[in-house]
Amino acid sequence: MLHVKRTLVTTALPYANGPVHLGHLAGVYLPADLYVRYKRLKGDNIIHIGGSDEHGVPITLTAEKEGISPRDVVDRYHGMNLDAFTKCGISFNYYGRTTSAVHHATAREFFSEIENKGMFTRKTEKQFFDKKANRFLSDRYITGTCPICSNPDANGDQCEQCGTHLSPLELINPKSKLSDATPELRETLHWYFPLGRFQSELESYVQSHDKEWRPNVINYTRTWLKQGLNDRAITRDLSWGIKLPLETPEASGKVLYVWFDAVLGYISFTKEWAAQSGQPELWREYWQDPECRMINFIGKDNVVFHTLMFPAILMAWNKGRKTDLYNLADNVPASEFMNFEGRKFSKSRNYAVYLGDFLEKFPADTLRYCIAMNYPENKDSDFSWLDFQNRTNGELADTLGNFIKRSIDFTNSRFDGKVPCECTPEEWKIPGIDWKETLEKLDQAFEAFHFREATSLGMDIARTANRFLTESEPWKVIKSDREGAAKTMAISLNLCYALALVLYPVIPETANRILAMLGVEKSIDDQLDSGKSCIAQILTPQLEKGHQLRKHSEILFTKIEDAELAPELKKIEDLLALTEEREAKNEAKAMDFSPLISFDEFLKVDLRVATVLDCQKIKKAGKLLKLQLKVGSETRQVLAGIAKHYSPEEMIGKNVILVANLAERTILNEISQGMILAVEGTDGKLFLVEPSGKEINGKKIQ
């Protein structure tokens, strides 16, 4: 088993511009809580730090849309999300806010340290400016047509339809979201962080963890490293945010870019936790003691911010220092996405189940269990209402809950509510469970972040316990062999205790209720003590002969009836109907043919057969492929938004149709010398137009 002096767990900061949904819970906050609760159960010294990201354009956009101040927005959603997390049993030691004075001071301190070392560069660049609103426009304040998929509603930073990361300058027909006016380009000065300067150090850092980190984290990070790291802007022209600690005209109106600001929240929140604990310097033991292990729980869309950018900021601080050096993360267990009824969660389309809404209707532990059993560890998973119902009814109610209630009720009715006899170490083996091996497997699963495996292990014990009680038939045996029935019940009651411990990280409120029904004075929460392992109690029976149970049991899990799910299924039906209606409109709109052109105009379009020689994915563009095409005697580079439909490997050797005389464009610093043709099906899938025949490469389409 792994032992360290102390462990710091951080969780990605959710934007305080809306409520968190089940996708957020599954990807970041529940896995972190499962890990933290297990480590506490082992007696490890561990703290869990989280908080709200309260700066950035999403906040100001929401404020302007609602006609309120950014402060009103973040106050509302910080409180709402913290309340939802608390009700769900997410056990933060501290949940902070990036608008706090401590955080502002910490972020400015980091900026000043790096600025004083002369590491930042200043660059004048062109940025869109809205004359009507009299302000520079950051990327999310601009909308326009995507140059990749022609989506007319692409944002200045990304097209949601094709997933391509964009810059505002790449949009076709850009418009300001503030005034709907066409913005003009003006020069503005920004500070840049020299990410490329730390390329070698970051490569060594990632290499040192390649056996421990998940493959998706390693692969995505190495893709960025392979393509070379560039300077990244750390300032924006905004009024809401952390102002630069510089008294110069150039710094006026500038705030820290949220990617630089937010990750430093982990440090400032730990400082606030230490101060709240009455030991203001205690935070250093978690950030500046090499014997502390740090784990950053994130979703897969935040990988490079935590494997490259945050470490680089800490490296910049550490450069040239002999004291107050910061630790880098030991692991960054990024989850894949959890979808909802087969589709991606989307706040913009309101296709989501919000955590607060869910907890008004169903118990938190049922949700925690269902998500843990569907944890998106190495691939995307799915939350469905029917699966939630089946797991609640079949596994939690019929298996676990049924066993606990039967054991306690029978003991209360036939043995005066007392453990009827001792359960010896030899008898503890009777159900067929190797407790030493179970403890080792449980530890290995949790320490490796295999939460589905750890949860399944607990439910397997519940199934074994249920089967043991059913096959032992104490209600029959007691008629002729009271001692034999007593032995069965002593074992069963101790199994109840062990199940509470094993499943505590997943269903903590239920685990404490089980111990209360068993008449145990201290809840598991009250037994947790740094340096003392509670989970090791499963190795031996804990309930002695004569121990008094609580007189009345309770139903741990109420089964979910079809009628309770009907409103939720109706919501999905309505949302899907709206989606189909929108898609139908788009399809109908697509049948409106373009304006007529003359034959001579058509002849101006030079369509050629090209063959794919090489194909690679583009960094920061989830749906973009870079193709090297052979067109007769020439070689062309073309970017195509088909990565979700064709892999690079299957593209090589294909014949495609190239618009050969299309003016070249620069997209994400890559040249695209033309366009290849594809057809979009009704389900959004793209199909390449693939000509076949011998010796047709370079030939013109007629």
Curated annotation (Swiss-Prot):
Q: Which positions are annotated as binding Zn(2+)?
A: C146, C149, C159, C162
Q: Provide the catalytic activity annotation.
A: tRNA(Met) + L-methionine + ATP = L-methionyl-tRNA(Met) + AMP + diphosphate
Top-level taxon of origin: Bacteria
**Where mainly found?**
cytoplasm
InterPro entries per UniProt:
aa-tRNA-synth_I_CS, Anticodon_Met, Met-tRNA-synth_bsu_C, Met-tRNA_ligase_1, Met-tRNA_synth, Methionyl/Leucyl_tRNA_Synth, MetRS_core, MetRS_Zn
Residue numbers covered by motif 'HIGH' region: 14-24
Q: How is the cofactor bound?
A: Binds 1 zinc ion per subunit.
Tell me where in or outside the cell this protein is found: Cytoplasm
Q: Motif range for 'KMSKS' region?
A: 344-348
What UniProt keywords apply to this chain's record, in alphabetical order?
A: Aminoacyl-tRNA synthetase, ATP-binding, Cytoplasm, Ligase, Metal-binding, Nucleotide-binding, Protein biosynthesis, RNA-binding, tRNA-binding, Zinc
> Quick one: which residues bind ATP?
K347
Assembly information from the UniProt record: Homodimer.
Q: What is this protein called?
A: Methionine--tRNA ligase
